[in-house]
Amino acid sequence: MKLEISAKRSQESIRAYALRIIHKNLLKMNLVPGMALSEQEIANELHISRTPVREAFIRLAHENILVILPQRGTYVEKIALEQVAESMFLRTTMESEVMKLACHSFPTRNIDQLEACLELQRISLKQKDYPRFFEQDGIFHGSIFAACGKHRIWQMIEQASLNYNRLRMMNLANDGENEMPMLFKHHKEMLTAIKQRDIEAGRILIKEHVGKVFSNLDDLKLQYPSYFKGGTEDTLI
């Protein structure tokens, strides 16, 4: 097991640090569905005790991201497509309303922020750096929420969207050369809609953009049948 590890943040507790690193590696598919996890191995990689890792496991199990089986171990939960659909509904509903607010009134300084974010996305696209593009994608959407005074709602959406985001990451990893240009185009058009105060165009774009998560699902299920819940693959082990 090899985790992508970043430094502990100032004022961040050991427990929060362990949770953040594990969550990030689940999202980036370094910890894949069905994988067995070891408290001790992760603790060793993070140079911390097992207790905060165990606490992170319990928290993630409560969120249906990990499965803890007594006497057997802890495993990464498979991607539940029903949960992906629920997250897509949540995002489409909330982002459409926030886009309406953004098209009605949006501060100039925040326009500049979105344009800077698009420039970073353009660089990631050119470098074919899909993890960085994914990160900037989230910053772009989160910045729109923040500019409309809805930052906490975006945080709640992100907390409820791990399965949705894992599938998005798989799409980028599997077909980034097609996915990234299309997503980048959507973002540019969203910014144009905000500038032109075109609510209808903005809401149509949101629906298309968020719903794109299912565009390559059949191919992904063929390549990685053990990663998804449903059908004959419904058993974890």
Describe each region flagged by the PLM.
Residues H62, L66-V67, Q159-Y164, N178-P181:
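Mobile beta-alpha loop/short-helix "lid" or hinge segments that flank ligand
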Residues Q71, M94, Q113-A116, M182-K185:
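Alpha-helix N-cap/N′ positions at the starts of helices
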Residues S87, T108-M169, H186-A193, A201-V213:
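Conserved amphipathic alpha-helical segments that form helical-bundle/coiled-coil interaction surfaces
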Residues S13, I111-D112, N178-M182:
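Short helix-capping and inter-helix turn/linker motifs at the boundaries of alpha-helical repeat units
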Residues A80-L81, M170-A173:
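Short alpha-helical transmembrane interface motifs in multi-pass membrane proteins
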Residues M1-H104, R109-N110, R152, R203, ...:
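Short linear motifs at protein or domain termini
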